[in-house]
Each structure stands twice: as structure tokens, then as C-alpha cells.
A protein has these predicted regions:
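C-terminal-of-GTPase-core extension/linker across diverse P-loop GTPases
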Residues: 1-3, 7-16, 20-27, 31, ...
């Protein structure tokens, strides 16, 4: 099902709306975003990425939505300055929260590449629901850690260790890394592993969720209670026992 929402205007324009119609339109658009699997963000090629576009991309990422960015009015762009690849790279750089999004350049006026938008949406939806075998994930993990091992914690000899990874869910694809201690994996190494998943497996247009689960800390074993002292038998009488009968007789 496709839902075409009204454009979400700047906050100042929404606040200035006398009848509240703008706010109602924004509320409906936000509900549509939360219901959707794939969000399509339309950008004016001449205007470029705006602050409002940036905020919306941040919302899509936080909601875990697959994203397709459509750069419209491509017919108005100077081809000597912009190529499709250069525009896509520029858009992904500015919309850093959805740097993984699919980018399609179109001209709605002339109907150019409009069908590519639907194809990108379908593919993003497929990737959003995709499951990957555990064996494939761990093969990628093994190669990634061989190429770049987890760092050693500064000031100690402790080193991060990854036992295995498995997929925990979809929409968006979510993965759990089982490690010795999640605190030993800084953000840059976590981003490195996400890039390795994308480079080797794909997921174009879909966000990924990576979770880290450390080994549970063992509770220190309680010492067993000392055995209760028991009263000793007759051997403890004073004098060390009785003397033998004739031991004390004198010689005549």
C-alpha cells in the first residue's frame, strides 16, 4: 500500500497556520511514517538538502524505516556539474543518519526515471524484511576480525572477543553479537562491523540494528559454613587416662 502524505512544512509555517490545518497535516504525515515500512523523502534538486529534510531523515532512522531519497527536478540540473553518482554521494553525506538510503534522480515533469522509484521502494522493503543464515553472518564476521581485530582496552591487557553473531529480527534487520564484554568495543569498531555486513551482504535502503551482549558476570561463590565443633570422646580426660594396676608397685 502506498500513502502519499502532504509536504511537511517548516515549524514556523505550521505555527502561523490560523486554522490549524498545517498541524493536522503534519500529524497525519507522522502517523503515516510510523505505519510505513519504507519512507520516501523527496528533495528538490535545485534547492538541495534542507534542514527540514535533515530532521525528517533523522526521524526515519530513529523509527527504523527503510528509506528511498528521490531527487526531483533532475532535468533542471547542469549535467556538466552533477552526475547521478555525485548527487547520490552528496545527498548521503548530508543526510548522515540515512547514509545507507537508496537515491533515485527523477523528473516528475517529464516522467523520467519515475518507475525507478517504485523499484527502489520494493527492493528496500525486501531488504528491510531480509533474513541471513547464521553461517553466512559468522563467515563475514570471521573475515572482518581477521582483517581488523578488536582493539585492546587502553591501560589494560583486556581485549574484545566476539564469539559469534546471529540475526534476532527484521524490519529492520537486527543482529546480536555475543562478546566477552560489550564495553571493550568502541563505536568506531562497531561501525566497522556494520560496514562489513553491508559490503558483503548488502541491505541497500535499509537500516541495521546491532546489539552487543556480554557474558554474564559470575557471582562469587559463597564459602561453605565451617563444620560445627563436636565434643571429643573419653580420651580427653585429665591425666591422659588411667595408670595400669601394677605400674606403681615398689620392689621388695
Amino acid at each position: 500500500m502506498l500513502i502519499d502524505t502532504a509536504g511537511i512544512r517548516k515549524r514556523s509555517r505550521v505555527a502561523d497556520s490560523p486554522d490549524g490545518a498545517e498541524q493536522l497535516s503534519v500529524d497525519r504525515a507522522m502517523r503515516a511514517v510510523r505505519r510505513a515500512d519504507v519512507a520516501v523523502l523527496v528533495i528538490d534538486a535545485l534547492e538541495g538538502v534542507t534542514q527540514q529534510d535533515f530532521r525528517l531523515s533523522e526521524l526515519f532512522a530513529s523509527e527504523g524505516k527503510a528509506v528511498v531519497v528521490v531527487v526531483n527536478k533532475w532535468d533542471r540540473v547542469d549535467p556538466r556539474i552533477w552526475s547521478v553518482e555525485k548527487m547520490a554521494e552528496n545527498v548521503r553525506t548530508q543526510l548522515r543518519h540515512v547514509s545507507w538510503a537508496s537515491v533515485v534522480c527523477t523528473s516528475a515533469l517529464y516522467g523520467r526515471h519515475v518507475e525507478d522509484v517504485l523499484q527502489a521502494v520494493i527492493e528496500a522493503g525486501v531488504q528491510h524484511r531480509r533474513r541471513v543464515p547464521t553461517a553466512t553472518l559468522n563467515m563475514v564476521l570471521r573475515e572482518a576480525t581477521q582483517w581488523k581485530a578488536p582493539p585492546t582496552q587502553r591501560g589494560s591487557l583486556r581485549k574484545g572477543r566476539i564469539y559469534y553473531v546471529t540475526q534476532a529480527g527484521t524490519r529492520p534487520p537486527s543482529f546480536v553479537f555475543f562478546v566477552n564484554d560489550e564495553k571493550l568495543f568502541p563505536d568506531d569498531y562497531r561501525r566497522y562491523l556494520e560496514r562489513q555486513l553491508r559490503d558483503n551482504i548488502g541491505f541497500p535502503g535499509s537500516p541495521l540494528r546491532l546489539f552487543w551482549r556480554g557474558k554474564p558476570k559470575r557471582e562469587p561463590r559463597a564459602k561453605p559454613p565451617a563444620p560445627a565443633a563436636t565434643a571429643s570422646s573419653g580420651g580427653g580426660a585429665a591425666g591422659g587416662g588411667r595408670r595400669s594396676g601394677g605400674g606403681g608397685s615398689s620392689r621388695r
